[in-house]
Amino acid sequence: MKNLQSKNNKSKNYELFLRKSAHIKSRQWWQKYLFKIRRLLYRYLPNQKLSLFKNASFTLLITDNKEIQDLNKRFRKQDSPTDVLSFPLIKNEQQNKRYLGDIVISHQKAKHQATNEKKSIEHELLLLFIHGYLHLLGYDHKTQKQEKLMFSLQNKILEKINVRN
């Protein structure tokens, strides 16, 4: 893939891809917060979700509106850019390890939303990552009950990270 910086970090159970056009935060910045978020998820997830989380890996792609719109159209039949997409996958029985799936974030959408909501880009990027990760763990917001549960956990983790708002 052209214009892509990748880092496979097996010890941290993730693969991080930053499009050069979307490189608004450094790899080190992402690594620091991915570690913190996963640690907080481990602390706050209910027991039935912890089994999904242990020994699990994922891929994170930070890209632009064009690419996320293409993905949104292809997989969700919606021809518009979105802020975050999650693609949950299933357990790999042979490796006794779970690959949770992929999270794709549009840096342009994140920047636009941060500006509109008068929040920092850092806050918005981490909010989108947490939101996408919770989808990989099976959380959703199709009903009010689901939304309350998911957003409560999302906000608790975001608050504990203590990123500039």
Question: Model-predicted segments: where are they?
Answer:
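An acidic/histidine-cluster motif and surrounding catalytic segment
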Residues: M1-L126, L136-N165
